C-alpha cells in the first residue's frame, strides 16, 4: 500500500508503517492543486486539520482506500463523499485527551495566578509583586461543563488540587461522576456555584453560544472562565462585556470564534485574558499517540484486518452488507429520536432483533443505535467503533437479544431506552433499502425517519392540530407531512403527532407550540 502523509505526524508513526511493508511518502505543505494532482497515486492519505479532503479531492483519488485523520475532528473531510466511494475514514479519538486536559488546568492556574502578566512584567524590568496578587484553587469550586473524555480528566485533576468539583452533562450518569467524587448538577446551579468554569463539550448546533450574556449574568462575581474546547461555545462579545463589567475576573482561551483571531479582537487587548494559539493537543506525546493510532489502522487495512476507529463504515460480511445497511440507518435514527425525546442521562438500552435480522451479526445494529443516542451531544467524537466503549464508560447497561420468528414482517428491530426513570420504546423494519419506524411507545406511526421532524404529545380533542397549523402558517413553516397515532381505538386520550416540515423551526416557535392549549410537549429532531 502506498501512503501519502500530507501533514506532519510523528516519525515513529511513519517508521511503523514502513516496517510493516507500506510505501510511505511525506509531502507536507502542498497546495490544493498539488494535492489533487498527487493523490491519485496513493491508496492511503494521512492529514491533520489543515488539509481539506473534500469531494473534489476524493473524486481525484482514484485508488484511495483509507483516509487517516491524525486527531479527532473530521470537519475537513467529506465523509459522505468518502463513503459513497467506499473509502474508510479513520480518526484518533482519545489520543490527545491527557494533553488537552493538562492544558486546561495550565490555563486555569495561569489565570488564577496571573502568570503570563507577571512574566511579561519581569521581562520589562519591573518588580510588581503586589500587582499580581492571585488566588488559591484549593477549596474553590470548579464547574466542568461536559464530562466526556477530556472533561473527566480535567475533573480528576481539579480534585487533585483539592477543589470541589461540580459537573453538568445531562448524558452522563450520576454513578459515572461519583467514581471520581464529582457532583452532577443542572446547568444553572453550576453557573451560580462555581468559582472557575471550564468548558469541555464539542462544537455542535446546540452548543454554539452555550455561554452567552444570560449565562454570564447567572455566574458568581469574580468567576474565572476557561475554554480549551472549541471556539464559539463561549460567546466572545458577551465574555468581553462580562470582563469589562467585573463579573468575570479572568478568562483563559485556547480556542476562538475565528482562528487565528483578528488583531482587533477586543479580548486580546485585556490584560486579564490569557491566550494560547489552539495548542491544547500540541504535545510530543499527543502527536505520537494520534500518529500511531492512525498508522496502526492503515496497517490493519493493508493487511485486510478490521480497523479500530472507522468513522463511516462498519465491518460487515460482504454478502450481508446490502441487507444490513438499512437496519444500521434505522437503528441510528431510532437512537436520535430517543436521545432528543428523553433528553437526559441514558441508563439502559435494550435491543431485540427478530426474524431474518436475528440470523445476522447484529453487533453493529446496537452500535448504530448507540451512535444515534450519542450523536446529538458528542457530534463527530462518536462513531460505530467508539459507540459501545463510550456507553460502557458512561455506565449504560446494554441488553441484546434475538428472536427467530416474527409475525407480519420478515425482520423486526425493537429498542427500549431508559433515562432517569423514563422509558421509550421504538419498533421498525426495512423493506429493501427503505427503513420505517412502525411504533413509538404505544403509538402506531409507520413513517420513514428522514428530514425535519417535530414530535409532539397532545390531548385528543378538536382544535389542537388546527392551532398548530395556524402557528406554523403564521411563521412561514410548511408542513410536508403529518402522522397522528392514538394509544387506543377510542378518542379522548393522548395522541402522538409527527410533523414533517420543510425547514427546522426556531426555538421560539417550538416554545410557542408547547404553550398551545392541548399540547403536552414538542421536540425537534433532524433525521
From Swiss-Prot:
Pathway: Amino-acid biosynthesis; L-serine biosynthesis; L-serine from 3-phospho-D-glycerate: step 1/3. Keywords: Amino-acid biosynthesis, NAD, Oxidoreductase, Serine biosynthesis. NAD(+) binds at residues 149-150, 169, 228-230, 254, 278-281. Its EC number is 1.1.1.95. The active site is at residues 230, 259, 278. Coiled coil: none annotated. Pfam families: 2-Hacid_dh (PF00389), 2-Hacid_dh_C (PF02826), ACT (PF01842), PGDH_inter (PF19304). InterPro entries: ACT-like_dom_sf, ACT_dom, ASB_dom_sf, D-2-hydroxyacid_DH, D-isomer_2_OHA_DH_cat_dom, D-isomer_DH_CS, D-isomer_DH_CS1, D-isomer_DH_NAD-bd. GO terms for biological process: L-serine biosynthetic process. One of its GO terms (molecular function) is NAD binding. Gene3D superfamilies: 3.30.70.260, D-3-phosphoglycerate dehydrogenase, domain 3, NAD(P)-binding Rossmann-like Domain. NCBIfam families: PGDH. This is D-3-phosphoglycerate dehydrogenase. It comes from Archaeoglobus fulgidus (strain ATCC 49558 / DSM 4304 / JCM 9628 / NBRC 100126 / VC-16). The gene is serA.
Amino acid at each position: 500500500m502506498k501512503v501519502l502523509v500530507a501533514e506532519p505526524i510523528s516519525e515513529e508513526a511513519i517508521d511503523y508503517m514502513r516496517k510493516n511493508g507500506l510505501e510511505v511518502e511525506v509531502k507536507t505543505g502542498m497546495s490544493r492543486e498539488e494535492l489533487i494532482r498527487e493523490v491519485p497515486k496513493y491508496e492511503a492519505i494521512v492529514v491533520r486539520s489543515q488539509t481539506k479532503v473534500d469531494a473534489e479531492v476524493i473524486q481525484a483519488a482514484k485508488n484511495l482506500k483509507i483516509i487517516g485523520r491524525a486527531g479527532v475532528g473530521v470537519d475537513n473531510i467529506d465523509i459522505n463523499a468518502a463513503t459513497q466511494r467506499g473509502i474508510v475514514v479513520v480518526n484518533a479519538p482519545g489520543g490527545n485527551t491527557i494533553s488537552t486536559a493538562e492544558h486546561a488546568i495550565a490555563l486555569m492556574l495561569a489565570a488564577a495566578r496571573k502568570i503570563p502578566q507577571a512574566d511579561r512584567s519581569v521581562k520589562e524590568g519591573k518588580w510588581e509583586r503586589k500587582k499580581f496578587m492571585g488566588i488559591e484553587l484549593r477549596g474553590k469550586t470548579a464547574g466542568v461543563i461536559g464530562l466526556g473524555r477530556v472533561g473527566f480528566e480535567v475533573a480528576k485533576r481539579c480534585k487533585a488540587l483539592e477543589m470541589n468539583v461540580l459537573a453538568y452533562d445531562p448524558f452522563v450518569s450520576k454513578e459515572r461522576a461519583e467514581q471520581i467524587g464529582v457532583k452532577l448538577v443542572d446547568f444553572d446551579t453550576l453557573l451560580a456555584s462555581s468559582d472557575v468554569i471550564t468548558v469541555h463539550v464539542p462544537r455542535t448546533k446546540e452548543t454554539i453560544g452555550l455561554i452567552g450574556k444570560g449565562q454570564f449574568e447567572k455566574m458568581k462575581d469574580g468567576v474565572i472562565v476557561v475554554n480549551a474546547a472549541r471556539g464559539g461555545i463561549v460567546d466572545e462579545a458577551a465574555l468581553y462585556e462580562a470582563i469589562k463589567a467585573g463579573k468575570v475576573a479572568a478568562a483563559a482561551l485556547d480556542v476562538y470564534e475565528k482562528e487565528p483571531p483578528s488583531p482587533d479582537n477586543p479580548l486580546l487587548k485585556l490584560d486579564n485574558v490569557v491566550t494560547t494559539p489552539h495548542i491544547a493537543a500540541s504535545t510530543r506525546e499527543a502527536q505520537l499517540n494520534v500518529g500511531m493510532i492512525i498508522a496502526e489502522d492503515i496497517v490493519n487495512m493493508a493487511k485486510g484486518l478490521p480497523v479500530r476507529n472507522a468513522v463511516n463504515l462498519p465491518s460487515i460480511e460482504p454478502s450481508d452488507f446490502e441487507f444490513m445497511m438499512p437496519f444500521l440507518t434505522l437503528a441510528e435514527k431510532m437512537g436520535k429520536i430517543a436521545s432528543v425525546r428523553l433528553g437526559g442521562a441514558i441508563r439502559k438500552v435494550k435491543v431485540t432483533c427478530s426474524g431474518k435480522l436475528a440470523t445476522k451479526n447484529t453487533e453493529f445494529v446496537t452500535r448504530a443505535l448507540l451512535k444515534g443516542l450519542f450523536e446529538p451531544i458528542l457530534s463527530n467524537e462518536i462513531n460505530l467503533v467508539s459507540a459501545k466503549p463510550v456507553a460502557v464508560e458512561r455506565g449504560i447497561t446494554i441488553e441484546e437479544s434475538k428472536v427467530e420468528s416474527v409475525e407480519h414482517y420478515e425482520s423486526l428491530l425493537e429498542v427500549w431506552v431508559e433515562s432517569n426513570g423514563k422509558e421509550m420504546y421504538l419498533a421498525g423494519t426495512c423493506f429493501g433499502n427503505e427503513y420505517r419506524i412502525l411504533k413509538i411507545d404505544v403509538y402506531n406511526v409507520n413513517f420513514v425517519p428522514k428530514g425535519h421532524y417535530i414530535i409532539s404529545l397532545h390531548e385528543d380533542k378538536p382544535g389542537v392540530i388546527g392551532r398548530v397549523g395556524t402557528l406554523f402558517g403564521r411563521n412561514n413553516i410548511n408542513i410536508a407531512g403529518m402522522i397522528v397515532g392514538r394509544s387506543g381505538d377510542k378518542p379522548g386520550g393522548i395522541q402522538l403527532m409527527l410533523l414533517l416540515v420543510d425547514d427546522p423551526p426556531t426555538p421560539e416557535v417550538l416554545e410557542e407550540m408547547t404553550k398551545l392549549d392541548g399540547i403536552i410537549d414538542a421536540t425537534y429532531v433532524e433525521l
